[in-house]
Amino acid sequence: MEAYLIAIAIGILIYMLLAFGLSLHYGFTGLINFGHVGFFAIGAYTSALLSLKGVPVPVSMAAAAAFAALAAYPLGMIALRLGSDYLAIVTLGFSESVRMVLQTEEWLTRGMHGLPGIPRLFAGWASPQTVDLWIMLLLLAVNAGALLLIHLVIRSPFGRVIEAVRDNEVAVRALGKDPAKFKTRSL
């Protein structure tokens, strides 16, 4: 029963991280982003593919974040200049495109069969019985760090500008700030 509860907690903590990102996009910036899961998939597959090639897990996780950010930047540059409705459509299309590529390109991801043999985090350091517990504790720490980071971002000058963009984009433009630039950074 304990292993089951830890597995459920791991899933909850992963979804909490996704919710923090959506909170920053929609709650503070006012961006309707349906592509969030596409960025998550890019990061997950990047980490998995690099780990399978023997890259250490922490390095592959950092590369995953970098690849997801690299995918978000050009998408944001294009879609955010059009308007919020177009952002929703473009990010939905992006997310669906990522899903289709991951499912059909068997040479890269093995398609619907998935990627077997991905090295587990903490596999060499902890006993098989406690690996999931360590993953859960790491995710708790990452969630706490992400929550603190979002809190600091929102209280910063950047955070005040993105909230102003959400509330009145015309006023932000009148004050000499480029709303598209701040939306892209938020994405």
Language model regions located:
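Transmembrane alpha-helices and adjacent helix-loop boundaries
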Residues: 2-187
